[in-house]
Design a protein with these regions (language model features):
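Short glycine-cluster motifs
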Residues: 1-30
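A contiguous loop/helix-start segment that scaffolds small-molecule binding in enzyme catalytic cores
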Residues: 21-23, 32-143
């Protein structure tokens, strides 16, 4: 499973969701020639979820591109070291994500997710504990 789908899912962000996003783009943030991918500007014009890999060094440019498209209040999440014990997550909007990155000291390796689906995030903290509790409640009702 690609990290572009698995890492957002691991913190409860779906890449598509009815009434939020019908599709998604997966884009490399930095090309072989160390420039920002031109596809980011195209993706910023769409309503799709945008997943950017290797984009932290271009975050300021990404923010500018989305802001230029009138999307400064669009939700964005950055997941550093996704699915690992040292995972860090920053969630905000295009307009404030750079200050969140600074505050949380986010850096590479990280995945950037942009779009309404970030607001659909399901809190998966303690999911196993909650599942166990639900199973216990079911057993009590059955008894």
């Amino acid at each position: 499973v690609s990290s572009s789908a698995a890492v957002p899912a691991s913190i409860g962000i779906p890449l598509t969701k009815r009434n939020a996003s019908e599709s998604f783009w997966v884009i490399t943030g930095t090309t072989k020639s160390h420039k920002i991918s031109g596809d980011i500007a195209l993706a910023a014009q769409s309503t799709a979820t945008v997943v950017i890999l290797m984009g932290m060094s271009k975050l300021s440019e990404i923010v500018q591109i989305f802001s230029n498209e009138g999307k400064s209040e669009t939700a964005i999440a950055i997941i550093q070291n996704g699915t690992r014990a040292n995972e860090k997550v920053g969630v905000g909007t295009i307009s404030n994500i750079e200050s969140i990155v600074e505050e949380k000291q986010l850096s590479n390796p990280a995945i950037i997710i942009i779009g309404e689906v970030v607001n659909q995030r399901v809190d998966l903290s303690n999911i196993y504990e909650r599942a166990d509790l639900a199973q216990q409640n079911t057993r009590k009702r059955s008894a």
